[in-house]
C-alpha cells in the first residue's frame, strides 16, 4: 500500500522549488503535485499517457485541444494522451493533483 497526506505533499513540494513533484510511480499509474503561481505560465507539452487533473486550490482556465473552461477547487479534468493542453489565466496560485495512466513517460 502507498498512502500520502496532502498537507505533507504540499510541504514537500514547497521545499523542492520545482513546479512538479512526483510522489508515486508504479507501472500502471503515476501521481504528482503541480503548482503554478498566479500569473504564471504553464509550458507543458502533450504527454504520451492519459492524464487526470484534480484542482486542490486556486483558480485558472484550462485549454484542452479547442475547448477552454474555468477550473477551481474541486474541478476534475481528463486529458487523453497526445492532446495539446495547458493551464492559463491563473488568477490564484493553482495546486493540482495529477494522475497519469500508465505511469508518466512509460509510453515513450
Where are the regions that the model predicts?
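A short, N-terminal "cap"/entry segment at the start of jelly-roll beta-barrel domains
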Residues: 1-33, 108
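Conserved short histidine dyad/triad with adjacent acidic residue
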Residues: 17, 32-47
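Short strand-coil-strand connectors
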Residues: 27, 63-67, 90
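Short, charged/polar surface micro-motifs in flexible loops or helix N-caps
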Residues: 27-29, 37-41, 59, 102-105
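Short, conserved beta-strand element in jelly-roll/cupin
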Residues: 35-36, 47-62
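Histidine-centered metal-chelating micro-motifs
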Residues: 41-42, 61, 77, 81-86
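Short acidic-glycine-tyrosine-enriched beta hairpin
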Residues: 67-81
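Ligand-binding loop in jelly-roll beta-barrel domains
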Residues: 81-106
